[in-house]
């Protein structure tokens, strides 16, 4: 009898826990994805903060020349970073227990893998949690679809690119100047500025910013007057009110006359779908571009494409970009190799006659 009561009590406790996890009445929704998301993101955040402040230098190139990234080793907020794991580790999974000592783990950049893997699992689960909450509230699932764009971008630079290049040392450093260094080296090695998918991503991000500003300014300029000139116009809106707070007909008429009629949306639902879809699709394409360049399917090469009738090269923007790429190439990882492949493969100019 006692055993049966204890089983019923434990079952009730489990049911209560399940109900609490899945309850939409909590101040912050937890969800089953949240059960994984919360510890992984906390782990990534705590390890990142500690490593950013106090991690010792990391032998990123695997040539016994450690690179310092933490604040305690002379960096500031701009120059500091969690340095990627060593090229000597390559693509090996490198948890703490794989190293002979904590010093070795830190020297080889173990914290980078710990932060990145927990962070990726955390943001995957955050996306799943968005779907889960939408499902329980009876909403459509497009919020998590939109969030998949930055998730895809993070996955591309932290996971797909290192996998394609053969080492986590090629992943993006976790810092401001480290991010810029990653971008410059990526341009040097893959000519990303000449990749059409990157161009679509630029159009998505800049276009999304433009459309967001246009939409916000149009709505703000066509608000229905509910307040006096001495009050904030924000007091003219009450949360949950049924009537429109701005005149979409006036906004449509203004924009249609400013450009032309069919450049202006007359359907609020179609407009907001467009505002969401444009940057999301652009970032999807950029993520896909990085994922293809990870395997060295690089941007277009139009070097020395234009020549005069005598066969002399007429330099174009592509040639200027190529020279910049070579400059980036020779400046990064200076001691890891004597000559970059691009320069070593060039035939030496003749000095005879």
Swiss-Prot record:
According to the record, how does the cofactor bind?
A: The D1/D2 heterodimer binds P680, chlorophylls that are the primary electron donor of PSII, and subsequent electron acceptors. It shares a non-heme iron and each subunit binds pheophytin, quinone, additional chlorophylls, carotenoids and lipids. D1 provides most of the ligands for the Mn4-Ca-O5 cluster of the oxygen-evolving complex (OEC). There is also a Cl(-1) ion associated with D1 and D2, which is required for oxygen evolution. The PSII complex binds additional chlorophylls, carotenoids and specific lipids.
Task: Name the top EC class.
Answer: oxidoreductase
- Residues bound to chlorophyll a ChlzD1 are 118
Propeptide stretches in the record: 345-353
PTM comment, free text: Tyr-161 forms a radical intermediate that is referred to as redox-active TyrZ, YZ or Y-Z. C-terminally processed by CtpA; processing is essential to allow assembly of the oxygen-evolving complex and thus photosynthetic growth.
Highest taxon listed in the record's lineage: Bacteria
Q: Name the Enzyme Commission number(s) assigned to this protein.
A: 1.10.3.9
An example Gene Ontology biological process: response to herbicide
The site (Tyrosine radical intermediate) lies at 161
Q: Which reaction does it catalyse?
A: 2 a plastoquinone + 4 hnu + 2 H2O = 2 a plastoquinol + O2
Instruction: Provide the membrane topology annotation.
Output: Multi-pass membrane protein
Q: Which chain regions cross the lipid bilayer? A: 29-46, 118-133, 142-156, 197-218, 274-288
Show the HAMAP family listed in the entry.
PSII_PsbA_D1
Q: What does this protein do?
A: Photosystem II (PSII) is a light-driven water:plastoquinone oxidoreductase that uses light energy to abstract electrons from H(2)O, generating O(2) and a proton gradient subsequently used for ATP formation. It consists of a core antenna complex that captures photons, and an electron transfer chain that converts photonic excitation into a charge separation. The D1/D2 (PsbA/PsbD) reaction center heterodimer binds P680, the primary electron donor of PSII as well as several subsequent electron acceptors.
Q: Which family does it belong to?
A: Belongs to the reaction center PufL/M/PsbA/D family.
Anything else the record notes? Cyanobacteria usually contain more than 2 copies of the psbA gene.
> Which protein is depicted?
Photosystem II protein D1
Q: Supply the source organism for this entry.
A: Prochlorothrix hollandica
According to the entry, what is the taxonomic lineage of the organism? Bacteria, Bacillati, Cyanobacteriota, Cyanophyceae, Prochlorotrichales
What gene is this protein a product of? psbA1
């Amino acid at each position: 009898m006692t055993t049966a009561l204890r089983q019923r009590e434990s079952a009730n406790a489990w049911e209560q826990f399940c109900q609490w996890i899945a309850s939409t009445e909590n101040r912050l929704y937890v969800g089953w994805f949240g059960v994984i998301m919360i510890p992984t993101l906390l782990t990534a955040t705590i390890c990142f903060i500690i490593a950013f402040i106090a991690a010792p230098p990391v032998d990123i190139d695997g040539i016994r020349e450690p690179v310092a990234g933490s604040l305690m080793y002379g960096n500031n907020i701009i120059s500091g970073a969690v340095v990627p794991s060593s090229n000597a580790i390559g693509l090996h999974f490198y948890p703490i227990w794989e190293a002979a000592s904590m010093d070795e783990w830190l020297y080889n950049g173990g914290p980078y893998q710990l932060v990145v893997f927990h962070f990726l699992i955390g943001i995957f689960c955050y996306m799943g949690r968005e779907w889960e909450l939408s499902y329980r509230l009876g909403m459509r699932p497009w919020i998590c679809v939109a969030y998949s764009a930055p998730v895809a971008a993070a996955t591309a630079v932290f996971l797909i690119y290192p996998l394609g290049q053969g080492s986590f040392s090629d992943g993006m450093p976790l810092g401001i100047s480290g991010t810029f260094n990653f971008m410059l080296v990526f341009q040097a090695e893959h000519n990303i500025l000449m990749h059409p998918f990157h161009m679509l991503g630029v159009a998505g991000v800049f276009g999304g910013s433009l459309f967001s500003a246009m939409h916000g300014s149009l709505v703000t300029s066509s608000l229905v007057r509910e307040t006096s000139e001495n009050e904030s116009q924000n007091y003219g809106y009450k949360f949950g009110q049924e009537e429109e707070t701005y005149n979409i007909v006036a906004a449509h008429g203004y924009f249609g006359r400013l450009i032309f009629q069919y450049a202006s949306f007359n359907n609020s639902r179609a407009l907001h779908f467009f505002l969401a879809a444009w940057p999301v699709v652009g970032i999807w394409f950029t993520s896909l571009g990085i994922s293809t360049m990870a395997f060295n399917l690089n941007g277009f090469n139009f070097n020395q494409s234009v020549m005069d009738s005598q066969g002399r090269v007429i330099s174009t923007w592509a040639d200027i970009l190529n020279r910049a790429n070579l400059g980036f190439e020779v400046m990064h990882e200076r001691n890891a190799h004597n000559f970059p492949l691009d320069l070593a493969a060039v035939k030496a100019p003749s000095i005879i006659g």
